[in-house]
């Protein structure tokens, strides 16, 4: 089969308004949505990328289409919905970190449905090396969850590998449902990208080795556990390697995990081992926290290579 794409990602893209000043309040307009951020990060890293979603036929949706065109992301899989809006979110900052407020109820992306996969997306999934999804892809609505699982089953049937990022947002769904759906996604995926915080909330496990054991026991062949400021741990089920963080002056960590995921997949498509790809993605994510917003600070390869130079 022709693998004309490296990564297809499925989820919800949104307009972002990121706080740059508290008094008086000022916000910088940008773009977000975890899997869209990851898709753009992968494209900037040189991957051939497509995005799968629904958008409103509104100004916000038009801006997102322009963004993907600028970034070289294939939009064949974007379905425009005249009956629902595109989603919007706000990011505020304080001494405890960054906080999100969403205006996404009833969004076009929440109207994704399992029939969209067979009707519109199966061929794109089959043309790609990787399908990337997240916990948010599952959480935004029951029908979107059905679409995400249909996409995963389509990927497995066509030999496309699946990467799944935990991205737990308990504001979107109850813990019991999140636990059940994410556990099933782990069973289906080839590469699981959890954070320690997410897995502690989902499973009650506090130690990284216990989380890695749980992940492999529930079906994930490869796991990259994100530890925030403590770096990452890469595991193939036999060997575990800790990758130290890069010390940088963090301004806004909004899309750091998405940057990590996109760069990791892009490097795997270029032939890196999982450890090599994770070291590259670790550096890219460190660079991404030095600017405001989820998309604008996503680095290009030259900057990542410069940080990796001894």
Outline where the language-model segments fall.
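Conserved N-terminal subdomain of the carbohydrate kinase-like
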Residues: 48-135, 306-310
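Conserved phosphate-binding/catalytic region of the ribokinase-like
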Residues: 1-8, 153-157, 204-310
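Structural alpha-helical scaffold elements that stabilize or flank donor/cofactor-binding regions
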Residues: 123-124, 184-185, 216
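Conserved beta-alpha-beta core of the PfkB/ribokinase-like small-molecule kinase fold
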Residues: 130-213, 230-231
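Short, electropositive alpha-helical surface patch
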Residues: 61-73, 155, 179-188, 248
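Glycine-rich phosphate/adenosyl-contacting loop at the front of the ribokinase-like
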Residues: 1-74, 251
